[in-house]
Each structure stands twice: as C-alpha cells, then as structure tokens.
C-alpha cells in the first residue's frame, strides 16, 4: 500500500484516509481503506494496476445496497473524471469520461438541439453509474441504456485499456454494461443522441384493467410520442394515470431549455409527505394533489424534462427512516397478475408503499445480466421503511416475496437496490450469471473488482462457474 500511495502522490491523485462511505439511503455504511478521486485516465490505470487489494467503483452513490463499495477496498470516486472528449452533431454522438453527470451532458448538447437518446428520469447520476446498472428511462420505443451505447473503454484488473462495442470485444461490452463494476472500470463511453424536440404533456386516468389495451393502441408504435409512464395508485392498485409527452410545434408554456438547478419541488415533496403519512394521504394524493400537478397544458423542451433533479425525492433518509426503491420487470401479458400479487403482498407485509411507476422497455437480448431479455413492463416501487433491524427484516421478507411473484410471472427484479434476494432467486432471475462469472474469472482472476453485490452472490474463493447452478425461468 505504501508503494501505491507514493505512486498516487507522484501522479497528483487525491488519496483520502480510511473512511466510511454510504449511499443515499444511509442504510449501508461501509468502511473502505482509501477513497481516490481521479481526474486523469493514467491515475485510474496506475491505481488499478498497482493496488494489491479489492477495488470498488463509485459515482453518484444512488444505488441502495452497497454496490459501490466493500469493506477494506480502495474506492475509486469517479465524480471528478468528467470531461467531454469528442462530439459530433452530424453523427449524433458524444464521447465522455464516465464521471460526468447527465446534467452536464444536457448542458453541453442542448446548444445543438440534441438530447441523450436514453437516460434515467433524473440527471444527477453519473454516466458510469448508469452504465454499470444498465438504466432505463421513460422513452417510448426504447429500453435499457445499452441500446444507445456505441462503445465503451474499460480498464481491466491488470491495468490494460480495452475498447469494446457491440461488434468488437462484444462479450466485454455486454458484460460490463449492467455488470455492476465486476469486470473493470468503465472510463469512457460513446453515447447516441436524439433531437431535442418540443413535447406536450397528456394525462388521463383509467382502470388498470384497461391500461394494457390502451397502451397497445395509443402508445406502442407511435413515433410522435417521446416519453410515457403510468402512475399506479396504492392502496387499491386499480387505477392508472397514463402520462405521455408528444412531439409538438405548439408554443412553449415553459421557455427554459433546462430545468433550473435551483428549482423548487415543493408540490412533489408535499405529495411524498402526504402519501407516506397514511392511507388517507394516499387517497388525497390520487383525488386532489395529482389532478393539481397534471392540470392544464404543458409544452416544454425534451431536455427540460430530462434535466429533473433527484432533489424532488428529498428527504431520502432521516435518523430512523429511509425512502427506498425496488423494481420488477414482467412480460406485458403478466402485468395485471403481478399487480394483484403486489397489492396482496404489500397489505400482508404492511409495507408503506408510496408510489408505483409503470414504464415500458423493449427487449435487451445481449446483456449478460439483462433485466429485459424480452419486452417488459417495469414497475418502480417507492416506499418508506424504518432503519431498525426489525424494520429491515420486514422489508427484506416483503422483497423476497415480491421477487418470487415476479419470477412466477416470468419476470425479473432489478439489482441496484437493497440486497435481499436469496442466491437461488438471483440465479433464477439472471440465468446467464454463470457466463458473467466465467468472464470475470478470465479478466479478473484475482477477484480485484468487488462490492457488496458480488460479495453476496459471488463470494471470494468460490468455484465460480461451477458453484452457480444454471436454473432457467
């Protein structure tokens, strides 16, 4: 370690003393050996090549289960590695260092009337973090982020730089994206861009029983639609507010090209406080607050909607509570069945479920850890839980039951959140995990890249591929 520290000093790389890192929930304190904040590629290469122990990779720290750290690791804090490296308006692509946030990309490309092809709903995330979990957004006709990635550059465990794309080193490409930092450090990415068009919001409420047919008729295949999601209202789980954004030439009602960084989200925060307080609060949100939020005509730029801030969800954590996410993916034909199980299990476990957002994603057949090997509806759950041991155990039991329900529907669950799934559930949801583990064994035989996710399902010293029975859905 002394040799590494000397090297880092010579490279001018900040090396912070041992400290405890956490994520936005405050539920996962992890004591790491060092936190390094690189600003240059060579600093990352040197740190990876010369550090003898485990290495973890962190960005915005919006994952919720220790996916960015493990005990005693050297954590690479990528947030200062944030430059635009190349841009082509003609090819509609941008190459960036992966510590850059989507907000910074939006600020760069907006002047050219361009927008990210795919990103998540909030712009605070780093590109590297988004790639590592293979995010999705609300974009109509799109799916996982990997669908907009032209190429990536990785630093492997031996310090070697490797370029990967769907055509070149494709196994690394499909393993590293959605690979939760298990194969190497994604240091650069070339991303596709789209037109920054004016979009008009549309909203209507319907029974859940009608939503899927309505989606097939009014959303699927409509090239003039840019964004869509459904809001499913607890506790009855029988009504959906369908929210769509359609290209338009109408006059703007919101002239700002990006959401102001200091925007107030008081109505949204009031909704969270209201719905988390009681069943009556959830009913008031459905009957009064959301009709207020979605009233009237709204015409804005695509980039304005893309630049929303995660502050909308604050406070995410307090002294004895946290607001937490889960996400499940089911084939479209199984939507109503899964929602029925969601309603039953939420009541059975007395979970304080605040919001369910329904998204659609096309198939991602290539990723080794694909959450959508087929077309899916994604259901994003936002709930409040206590931070006591008993409350954590109750949330874990609810989560495992929901995972079983998703698996029974031919679906999967998402990995960036609290690590409650059993090993058997993980393998059932991700049947290509043995391929990922075999690839990791080839490119990281010393098991250098670690975090709590991989410590749980791929513990050090395991006979990696052989210890993981392949169980298909």
Predicted regions, residues:
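Bacterial N-terminal signal peptides
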Residues: 4-14
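Glycine-rich N-terminal segment of FAD-binding domains in flavoprotein oxidoreductases
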Residues: 27-120, 134-139, 358
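Structural signature of FAD isoalloxazine-binding scaffolds in flavoprotein oxidoreductases
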Residues: 65-85, 137-159, 185-192, 379
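Short, acidic, Ser/Thr-enriched surface-loop or helix-capping motifs
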Residues: 89, 126, 156
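C-terminal substrate-binding/cap subdomain adjacent to the FAD-binding core in PCMH-type
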Residues: 150-337, 341-344, 352, 360
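Substrate-recognition/cap regions that form aromatic- and gly/pro-loop-enriched pockets
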Residues: 301-428
């Amino acid at each position: 370690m002394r040799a590494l520290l000397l090297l880092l000093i010579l490279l001018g790389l900040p090396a912070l003393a041992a400290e405890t890192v956490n994520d936005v929930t405050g539920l996962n304190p992890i004591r790491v050996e060092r936190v390094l904040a690189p600003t240059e590629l060579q600093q990352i290469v040197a740190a990876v090549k010369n550090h003898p122990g485990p290495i973890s990779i962190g960005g915005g720290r919006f994952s919720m289960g220790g996916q960015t750290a493990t005990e005693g690791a050297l954590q690479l804090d990528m947030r200062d590695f944030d430059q635009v490296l190349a841009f082509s308006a003609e090819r509609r692509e941008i190459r960036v260092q992966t510590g850059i946030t989507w907000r910074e990309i939006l600020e760069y490309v907006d002047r050219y009337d361009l927008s990210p092809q795919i990103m998540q709903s909030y712009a605070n995330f780093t590109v590297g973090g988004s790639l590592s979990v293979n995010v999705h957004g609300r974009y109509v006709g799109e799916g996982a982020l990997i669908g907009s990635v032209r190429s990536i550059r990785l630093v492997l465990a031996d310090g070697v730089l490797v370029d990967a794309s769907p055509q070149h080193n494709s196994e690394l490409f499909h393993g590293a994206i959605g690979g939760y930092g298990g194969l190497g450090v994604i240091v650069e990415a070339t991303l596709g861009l789209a037109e920054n068009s004016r979009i008009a919001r549309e909203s209507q409420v319907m029974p859940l029983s009608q939503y899927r047919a309505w989606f097939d008729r009014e959303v699927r295949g409509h090239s003039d639609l840019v964004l869509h999601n459904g809001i499913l209202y607890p506790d009855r789980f029988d009504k959906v507010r369908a929210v769509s954004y359609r290209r338009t030439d109408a006059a703007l009602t919101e002239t700002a090209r990006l959401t102001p960084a200091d925007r107030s989200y008081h109505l949204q925060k009031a909704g969270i406080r209201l719905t988390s307080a009681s069943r009556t609060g959830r009913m008031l949100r459905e009957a009064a607050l959301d009709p207020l939020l979605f009233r009237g005509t709204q015409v804005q730029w695509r980039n304005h909607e893309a630049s929303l801030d995660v502050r909308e969800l604050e406070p995410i954590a307090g002294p004895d509570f946290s607001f937490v996410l889960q996400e499940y993916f089911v084939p479209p034909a199984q939507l109503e069945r899964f929602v029925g199980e969601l309603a039953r299990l939420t009541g059975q476990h007395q979970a304080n479920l605040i919001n369910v957002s329904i998204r659609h994603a096309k198939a991602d057949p290539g990723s080794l850890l694909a959450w959508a090997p087929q077309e899916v509806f994604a259901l994003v759950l936002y709930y409040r839980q206590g931070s006591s041991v008993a409350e954590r155990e109750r949330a874990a039991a609810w989560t495992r039951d929901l995972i079983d329900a998703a698996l029974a529907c031919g679906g999967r669950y998402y990995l960036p959140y609290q690590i409650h799934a059993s090993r058997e559930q993980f393998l059932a949801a991700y049947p290509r995990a043995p391929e990922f583990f075999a690839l990791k064994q080839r490119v990281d035989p010393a098991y250098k890249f670690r975090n709590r996710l991989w410590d749980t399902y791929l513990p050090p010293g395991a006979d990696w591929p052989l210890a993981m029975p392949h169980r298909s859905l």
